[in-house]
Every structure is written in structure tokens, then in C-alpha cells.
């Protein structure tokens, strides 16, 4: 802000805090951010059933906070802390186009089922059909599985492996891929029975392993695929982790305790990525027979960031003066 012909950075931050809702009332702003996320999606994207993935992103928080702060969630140690601001997103990949469709703030007391329901409700509001849903091990519990059994689309979840020899670890056996059913009891959720697909693949140096590797997936709903096909389908989920890495490249940093301000920065960053993909596929593409040729090398993310900065400078004016303060 100091380089622009406009208000100072501290003035902007103060005014922004005055406009944003208090941390306890983020629902309205969350809805506005979700509308902004999908404001420039291709029309054809919203008319077809899409493969979707949901996941959590943990952003480390190193500041002081109240013990009962709902915006701070505990997690595995990362970047020197076990305290995080946590967000959940729902994401799709269609013809190599990656778009974030929904975003929600995850509070400390919330279960993963709560946030999954919120994300799916957002997508239903867009009238987007889900062809297939991919979830990681963080969503593997009986409450989520029971809820997904009531949904009209199939879901693939990475199975959590527990036990030394028994439990789900006993399913990782044999040298051939296979399908079985598994009944899991829980002390807090109802007992659930579900299909498990075990895919066997030779690592050949991948996954930092050698020899035979086994991958187990829970399949909820009707899905007539071989376990190896399930394995390859599930690899689509890793696009969502790519979106988190890119989001962190364009996300504004802050030391503020305000969870609303931090949610705003995450929402703006994801919107910038959605716009980047939209511009590449609509403006940086060469028509040809069949699928269009998108010239990704002409608009890398670094250049997109610089373009946005140039637009801000053109609109706000760039300050070329250096003011030397007088001696006291």
C-alpha cells in the first residue's frame, strides 16, 4: 500500500477490520466468499456430473490464543506448532481444469461430518451433479460412511489401517487385488458394513518403497470398477493438495488473531486461482480440431500475480516519490 497513491497499509487494515463481521458471525461472509469462488466458472462445467474431492488444509498459527478459541484447531506438529487455522474445501478436476467449488471454516468443536455436509450443501446449491466423491483418511469414520450411504453418488475413501496383525491391517494380504466386505464397530458411532477394495501394485521405486504395495479403499455406493481402477481414480484426489500449495503462493499473510480476516485471505487466494484457470482456458488457448490447446507456459502463476499487481497499480496509481523526513 505504501507504494500506491492511496491510503496507508495501517489505514486499510483498520477499515477492513471495521467492515468484517466479528469472528462469531462468519457465516454470512463465508457465503459471500463461496459465491465469489464460482462467479467465473465455465457454464458447461455446471451442467455435467463432476468428480469431486474434499479435504482439509491446516495453516500453522504461532500466536497466543484463548483456550476456548473455536477458530484454533489442534493437529499433528507442523512448522513448529500444533495449533492451526483449519479450512475445508471441495474441489473438482474436469479435462485438466481444477476449480475450487466450496470453502468453509472448520471450528475446533466440529466433526468432519458437519463440515462435509456443509460443503455438499454448497455444491447442491450450485446444482452441480457429483459423479464421484474422493475423501482421504481424515473422513474415515462410521458416521461419515453412514451419511454417504444415503447419497446418490458413489464415494471412495482411503481406508485407515489399524492394528498390528488384526483389524484393518489383516486386509492387506495376498499378492492379487481383491474386493471384500468389512464390518467395523465403534464406541461412539453405529456399526457399519462396507466394501473394501485392495489394490496390489509393484512400487518400482515409487512411494519411497520397493516390491509389492497394497492400497485399501472404502467404496460407498454402486461402483463397478476393478481395485486397480479404483487406485487410478483415487489419484485424481491429489489435485486438491496441489490447489493448497498454489493457494499458499498467493495468500496474503497476517499476524492477526481474527479468524474472519484469515478466512477472507484464504477465500481471495482460492478465487485468484479459479480466475487464473478460467483465463488460461478461455484466453490463452489455441483452437484446433478436438480439444483446444491451452498454452500454459504463457501464463504461469508467477506472471498472473504480476498482472494482478499491475492492474492494481494502474487503478490506484503508483507513487514514484520518496519523502525524506526532516531531522528532528
Residue ranges: model-predicted function:
Residues 1-2, 11-12, 48-62, 90, ...:
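Short, conserved catalytic/metal-binding motifs centered on acidic residues
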Residues 72-129, 212-215:
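Electropositive, glycine- and tryptophan-enriched low-complexity nucleic-acid-binding patches
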Residues 3, 172-204, 211, 249, ...:
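A short, flexible helix-boundary coil/loop motif
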Residues 109-167:
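Domain-level cores of phosphate- or acyl-group-handling catalytic modules
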Residues 151-248, 305:
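An anionic, glycine-rich sequence signature occurring as long contiguous blocks
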Residues 225-234, 246-266, 283-286:
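Short, solvent-exposed helix-loop connector elements
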Residues 26-40, 113-118, 217-223:
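Short, motif-level signal for alpha-helix interfacial/capping segments enriched in acidic residues
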Residues 10, 14-95:
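Active-site-proximal, Lys/Arg-enriched surface segment
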